Curated annotation (Swiss-Prot):
Organism: Oryza sativa subsp. indica
Protein known as: Homeobox-leucine zipper protein HOX24
PANTHER family hit by this protein: HOMEOBOX-LEUCINE ZIPPER PROTEIN, HOMEOBOX-LEUCINE ZIPPER PROTEIN HOX24
A single GO BP: positive regulation of DNA-templated transcription
Region listing for Leucine-zipper, in residue ranges: 121-165
Family affiliation: Belongs to the HD-ZIP homeobox family. Class I subfamily.
DNA-binding region: 61-122
Principal location listed in the UniProt entry: nucleus
Tissues and organs where the protein is expressed, per its UniProt entry: Expressed in roots and panicles.
Gene this chain is encoded by: HOX24
Segments crossing the lipid bilayer: none
Function: Probable transcription factor.
Database matches in InterPro entries: HD, HDZip_class_I_plant, Homeobox_CS, Homeodomain-like_sf, HTH_motif, Leu_zip_homeo
Length: 262
């Protein structure tokens, strides 16, 4: 049973992210080798076609079979490739070709094509893994950004409440201080008023003592007045206290007038 693997396989298309200087150099070298192999194969096919024309049509069929690998050959090449990822030495290629009944150049070209396809698939796999990690990190960053905005909003709200509470506390303290000042001021005014009233009351009650001597003269408030017996009706010969406390009345109403009336 023949395999679909061709002897000459076209190089894989470069991936959109597999665009490096090393890859470009490998691809150019690969193309040069493929062109040389195609020229060599065309020359061999021309020689085989001439032989077929002279000896029959079997030569063309033999050339077509040379361009394909059998399933057993492909399986052996795949096993060797997965076991030996590194490039094979020329001696190893010759031994493998002799075991599989192939030419060393056929084995070298197959390994070269297989390695290019494997690199492309590996790069795609790595890119997919990195892309998944990037998407996860991007989602995490967005989540952290939203969380940061939410925390900033909470901080602003708490700061506003704290400032409002401090303002209210300051206004209450100011009002209390003003109230204390008013209370102190009222206390001082009340004390002053009480002092004035008590002073007036004490001055009114501070009545000088009237002494009546044997000669009939009376001393009241530090002044001497002649005692008149006609004043007995006022209270046993003693003047009321208010009159003693107000000497102006005595100046306005002298004792002479009282005697004249009597």
């Amino acid at each position: 049973m023949e395999s679909d693997c061709q002897f000459l396989v076209a190089p894989p298309q470069p991936h959109m992210y597999y665009d490096t200087a090393a890859a470009a150099v490998d691809e150019a070298q690969f193309l040069r080798q493929m062109v040389a192999a195609a020229d060599h194969h065309a020359a061999a096919a021309g020689r085989g076609g001439g032989d077929g024309d002279g000896g029959g049509g079997g030569g063309g069929g033999g050339g077509e079979r040379k361009r394909r690998f059998t399933e057993e050959q492909v399986r052996s090449l795949e096993t060797t490739f997965h076991a030996r990822r590194a490039k094979l030495e020329p001696r190893e290629k010759a031994e493998l070709a002799r075991e599989l009944g192939l030419q060393p150049r056929q084995v070298a070209i197959w390994f070269q094509n297989k390695r290019a396809r494997w690199r492309s698939k590996q790069i795609e796999h790595d890119y997919a893994a990195l892309r998944a990690q990037y998407d996860a990190l991007h989602a995490r960053v967005e989540s952290l950004r939203q969380e940061k905005l939410a925390l900033a909003a909470q901080v602003d709200e708490l700061r506003g409440k704290l400032n409002e509470r401090q303002d209210q506390s300051g206004s209450c303290d100011g009002g209390g201080a003003e109230g204390d000042d008013d209370d102190k001021r009222n206390s001082v005014m009340n004390a002053s008023s009480s002092g004035l009233v008590e002073e007036d009351y004490v001055s009114c009650l501070a009545v000088p003592v009237v002494d009546v001597s044997e000669d009939g003269s009376a001393a009241c408030g530090g002044s001497s007045y002649e005692y008149d017996h006609h004043l007995d009706y006022l209270g046993g010969g003693q003047l009321p206290d208010p009159f003693c406390g107000m000497p102006d009345l005595w100046e306005t109403w002298p004792m002479v007038e009282w005697n004249a009336v009597a």
